[in-house]
Amino acid sequence: MTLDTIIETYMPIAKPLSMAMERQKKHISLIIFKRKIIAVGQNIFKTHPDTLRLGYRTADMHSELDAFRKVPKSLRGEKLILVNFRFNRFGHFRNSKPCSVCAKWCGEVFHKIYYTDDNGLQRL
């Protein structure tokens, strides 16, 4: 998939989800398998034991981990694609590059990782 194809296909799904969030930083993570969305995650500001186990400084859950928890166990290990979106209140792209902790474990479980920044979609 090209970057343009990813934007055209998945942005219409991610943008309304992001814009509906009441948080200032509206991160949405989509996990894709065979061009289908199999999991959606968002930043969650409540404690979860996986966040501390993976080495996060706080117990808040990032959108990548929230989405990955929803992936069926039968698909873990397959060629999954992670796409992170973040939009400002005007609907423009903002930086949603995975933090260093997310980047480390995501690099081990995802075949490809994409994220938005002020210039559009980038590949990690």
Predicted regions, residues:
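Short beta-strand scaffold segments in enzyme catalytic cores
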Residues: 26-39
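Zn2+-dependent cytidine deaminase-like catalytic core
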Residues: 40-124
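Gly/Ser-rich catalytic serine loop of serine hydrolases
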Residues: 23-28, 96
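Short, basic/aromatic recognition patches
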Residues: 1-25
